[in-house]
């Protein structure tokens, strides 16, 4: 089977310099959703017709299995499909999709493809309570499709028809070239419409069949930011419903955003306003607090992530405790039972089993062993203005508050670092490290008094 995806439109009503098909739905371009669905049908040829912003669109979705045809002038959907003809296998049927209709299920498309086997012409239709504005499917007394009539051309009787054309079709490819060549642009827009092909197919004696989606929203397209927002909510609702079916506890399914793939184990609980991006895995008994953002991360069983935590590219072991207001950046690896508390940032660092950094700390480019206590206000000074260096803190170290570790530096096993210490040289195992300081208390001191104006 050939699949052609039309993605050449300007999208004027989006009021944006970004090509319409590149506007994000759940964090990914609209067109990417359509391509992914198309791939599940395993086409032999997958062709995207580009036009407005062609180079930008091609760069966004380029892949070895995707070919591109260019529609230099936007002269209608029929003209767009014609540009793809040289790239198609004429011996196989062609399925035509739209780059701004992202939620059509693969099962729906397969149903249409199956209906159109043996050289039939297939149309995906949907029955609406209010079909205003859509082309109607006209059938004869025997129920066979005879034509598609647009709203402006429909008779009062035809306007009562609730079955409408979605634009998604399956057509014999060998005949498609002839039919497209016979299209006329005698309409207000001066364009060649793919919908006109159905009458040519009927005139040529081809049987026209239809299939319908399970849900109306599968055929909704995007022509404005309002419609994009509507589809975003539909998509997120579908994701939330699937998570609930799988046993995930959602404090409010309407306040969850998944912009990628979220895999959850048993008894996972997610509070409100959480965003998951990229590939995220939550193991059994993970609890996520409110207003967290988690991107490309794996979270071990029994972990608790408190509110307002931001995690990006991190790996968390089992029974870790994170947040609130913590930030784990790419390369952060936490072993089982590690704690990272409020206003702690970890970047490209390993924190060992049971180690804790509970308050106001920066840990960057570091290797921290097991059972280490990092006091509040500790900083690994990893950057000299030109290069990054690593800090190594071995097992069972106690780091007092307000400590600076100037990398590259190593702190041996069992070391105790006094509060307010700057470490710039390696410290051997078991020692106490401190900077000698003198405390002075003076009598007779009088605080300044604010002058009265």
Swiss-Prot record:
This protein's pathway: Nucleotide-sugar biosynthesis; UDP-N-acetyl-alpha-D-glucosamine biosynthesis; N-acetyl-alpha-D-glucosamine 1-phosphate from alpha-D-glucosamine 6-phosphate (route II): step 2/2; Nucleotide-sugar biosynthesis; UDP-N-acetyl-alpha-D-glucosamine biosynthesis; UDP-N-acetyl-alpha-D-glucosamine from N-acetyl-alpha-D-glucosamine 1-phosphate: step 1/1; Bacterial outer membrane biogenesis; LPS lipid A biosynthesis
Main location class: cytoplasm
Signal peptide: none
Residues binding acetyl-CoA, per UniProt: 376, 382-383, 401, 419
Residues that hold Mg(2+) according to the record: 100, 223
Region N-acetyltransferase, residue ranges: 247-453
Reactions mediated catalytically: alpha-D-glucosamine 1-phosphate + acetyl-CoA = N-acetyl-alpha-D-glucosamine 1-phosphate + CoA + H(+); N-acetyl-alpha-D-glucosamine 1-phosphate + UTP + H(+) = UDP-N-acetyl-alpha-D-glucosamine + diphosphate
Pfam families: Hexapep (PF00132), NTP_transf_3 (PF12804)
Region annotated Pyrophosphorylase, chain positions: 1-225
Residues annotated to bind UDP-N-acetyl-alpha-D-glucosamine: 6-9, 20, 71, 76-77, 98-100, 135, 150, 165, 223, 329, 347, 362, 373
InterPro entries: Bifunctional_GlmU, GlmU-like, GlmU_C_LbH, Hexapep, Hexapep_transf_CS, MobA-like_NTP_Trfase, Nucleotide-diphossugar_trans, Trimer_LpxA-like_sf
Any one biological process term the GO annotation gives: cell wall organization
Annotated GO CC locations: cytoplasm; membrane
Protein family membership: In the N-terminal section; belongs to the N-acetylglucosamine-1-phosphate uridyltransferase family. In the C-terminal section; belongs to the transferase hexapeptide repeat family.
Assembly: Homotrimer.
PANTHER family named in the record: BIFUNCTIONAL PROTEIN GLMU (PTHR43584:SF3), NUCLEOTIDYL TRANSFERASE (PTHR43584)
Protein name, per record: Bifunctional protein GlmU
Phylogenetic placement of the source organism: Bacteria, Pseudomonadati, Pseudomonadota, Betaproteobacteria, Burkholderiales
